[in-house]
């Protein structure tokens, strides 16, 4: 069994905790992927994890594949400037005007780590505020009350992070203006930056009140701190302008990843030119990397952006998520389940609970065991939902009406079976 072999060479048998599927005896084994489908050791599955949001056009999209193949013919790494990376950056700036200059790195973790370092270098202050349940990667600055896999596995604050580092990270409740203002007051003139997911996508799906995001912008500006929007998930998924475009909030710095790379490793941090000009070699805040602006990744990303600029991928993906959200709500209601469904653009998640979901505490109060049981049953019916209530389901441009109907028919059977099994 491949998973048993994997356990001999990888901690827990995987190379990222979210892949371990804690409620199942083994991880899924991928064989291939195309359009909305994953081909695995459990057969063909309709995919709603979509590489945790990294795929927005659909798996193995022909335009992206063709662009990457053409790049591979020319070579795959030079450690020199390329035309593609400039064109890619210009396209990002065109759609996200707040990103006046940027540095292209390799992961979302690198992007947020460098954005925080830059904010500290610019402000000459050391404390940051993050929010309960927001996930900004796996570096020491932010592994305090984190979401995503850290929440799934019950280790939101990682071992191995020095207390001297933890002291520089203040955690405030998400979507709570009064608590945020109190945290800013307590930190005082040591506050370098506030980093936030403008839509929380790593603790399930939490859509904040507009007043909360407005308060982040106004208060950071008032005290001379920088506002960092972590749009690794929402960037180029909630539209070409990301969450900041949707909500009309202009941050000082933005981090990007996932969808903007078309499924290839990428991370970006960027923002106001006067801040970004502090990054080496034009300034004293150091960042470097052999694989920065990797030719294959930026080529794939440019192909994705050109496709997204037509608008059609967003329309298809958003419509699919809307139909799925309404369909799940209808199925659950008819079968007597208390289920809350949250949806924005091509992101959705549902929770077994009464009442709304507006904070991480609301997510914690939902029935995680019920979600995991449904996930397991749905797999048997050919549907791969995101494997934790602390993650998000994603649709893509490949999730057509026919695929959605196929999914809802399978989920109806899954919910019926769940009802039978729980009595």
Swiss-Prot record:
Q: What is this protein called?
A: Glutamate-1-semialdehyde 2,1-aminomutase
What's the domain of life for this entry? Archaea
Q: Where in the cell is it found?
A: Cytoplasm
What HAMAP family is this protein classified in? Answer: HemL_aminotrans_3
Statement: the UniProt record of this protein carries the keyword Cytoplasm = yes
Please write the reaction equations for the catalytic activity of this protein.
(S)-4-amino-5-oxopentanoate = 5-aminolevulinate
The cofactor required is: pyridoxal 5'-phosphate
Give the organism the record lists: Pyrobaculum arsenaticum (strain DSM 13514 / JCM 11321 / PZ6)
Give the PROSITE patterns listed for this entry. AA_TRANSFER_CLASS_3
Provide a Gene Ontology MF annotation, just one. transaminase activity
Keyword Isomerase among record annotations: yes
What EC number(s) would the UniProt record show? Answer: 5.4.3.8
């Amino acid at each position: 069994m491949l998973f048993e072999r994997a356990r001999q060479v990888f901690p827990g048998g995987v190379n990222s905790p979210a892949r371990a599927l804690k409620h199942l005896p083994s991880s899924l084994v991928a064989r291939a992927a195309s359009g909305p489908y994953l081909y695995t050791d459990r057969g063909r599955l309709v995919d709603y994890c979509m590489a945790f949001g990294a795929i927005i056009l659909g798996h193995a999209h022909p335009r992206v594949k063709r662009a990457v193949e053409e790049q591979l013919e020319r070579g795959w790494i030079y450690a020199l400037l390329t035309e593609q990376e400039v064109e890619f950056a210009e396209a990002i700036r065109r759609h996200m005007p707040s990103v006046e200059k940027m540095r292209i790195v390799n992961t979302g973790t690198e992007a947020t780590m460098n954005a925080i370092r830059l904010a500290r270098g610019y402000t000459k202050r050391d404390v940051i505020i993050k929010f309960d349940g927001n996930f900004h990667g796996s570096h020491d600055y932010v592994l305090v009350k984190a979401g995503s896999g850290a929440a799934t596995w019950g280790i939101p604050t990682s071992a191995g992070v020095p207390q001297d580092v933890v002291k520089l990270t203040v955690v405030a409740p998400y979507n709570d203006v009064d608590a945020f203002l109190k945290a800013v007051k307590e930190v005082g003139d040591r506050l370098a930056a506030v980093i936030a997911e403008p839509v929380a996508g790593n603790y399930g799906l939490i859509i904040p009140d507009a007043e909360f995001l407005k308060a982040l912008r106004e208060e950071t500006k008032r005290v001379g701190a920088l506002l960092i929007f972590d749009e690794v998930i929402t960037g180029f998924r909630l539209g070409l302008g990301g969450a900041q475009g949707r909500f009309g909030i202009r941050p000082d710095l933005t981090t990007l990843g996932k969808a903007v790379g078309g499924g290839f490793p990428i991370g970006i941090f960027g923002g106001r030119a006067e801040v970004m000009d502090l990054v080496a070699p034009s300034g004293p805040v150091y960042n470097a990397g052999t694989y920065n602006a990797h030719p294959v990744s930026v080529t794939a990303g440019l192909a994705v952006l050109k496709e997204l600029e037509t608008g059609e991928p967003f329309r298809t993906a958003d419509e699919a998520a809307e139909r799925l959200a309404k369909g799940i709500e209808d199925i659950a209601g008819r079968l007597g389940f208390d289920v809350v469904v949250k949806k924005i653009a091509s992101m959705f998640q549902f929770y077994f609970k009464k009442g709304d979901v507006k904070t991480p505490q609301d997510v914690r109060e939902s029935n995680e065991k019920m979600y995991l049981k449904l996930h397991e049953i749905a797999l048997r019916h050919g549907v791969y939902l995101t494997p934790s209530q602390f993650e998000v389901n994603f649709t893509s441009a490949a999730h057509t009406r026919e695929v959605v109907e196929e999914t809802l028919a399978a989920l109806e059977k899954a919910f019926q079976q769940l009802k039978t099994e729980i009595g």
